[in-house]
């Protein structure tokens, strides 16, 4: 039977890119303060948003009224969409193993 550890690995263990390094430098301290459950919810939320924003058939993303009422405004939504289009495989490759690790740990509790 495979043994899993609950010890945390640094984010750059999963993906060591300039974008990940900048993310760690900018938000690492705040992310460390989150509880385990909050980190799991954050990763899940990012993955779901990534899937939703990157779906070209999603009318919600194209809706100007939706975009104008987002927290970050239309420019940020459009910029995020461009980033997601270019980085989707890398982001999913980073987030999905983390979510799977949290799910395994939750199953053992």
Language-model features and meaning:
Residues 1-109:
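Short amphipathic alpha-helical interaction elements located at domain edges
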């Amino acid at each position: 039977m495979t043994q899993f550890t609950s010890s945390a690995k640094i984010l750059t263990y999963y993906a060591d890119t300039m974008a990940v390094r900048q993310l760690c430098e900018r938000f690492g301290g705040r992310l460390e303060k989150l509880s385990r459950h909050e980190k799991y919810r954050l990763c899940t939320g990012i993955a779901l948003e990534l899937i939703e924003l990157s779906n070209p058939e999603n009318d919600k993303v194209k809706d100007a009224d939706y975009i104008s009422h987002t927290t970050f405004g239309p420019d940020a939504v459009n910029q995020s969409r461009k980033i997601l289009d270019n980085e989707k495989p890398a982001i999913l490759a980073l987030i999905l193993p983390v979510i799977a690790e949290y799910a395994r740990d939750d199953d053992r509790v």
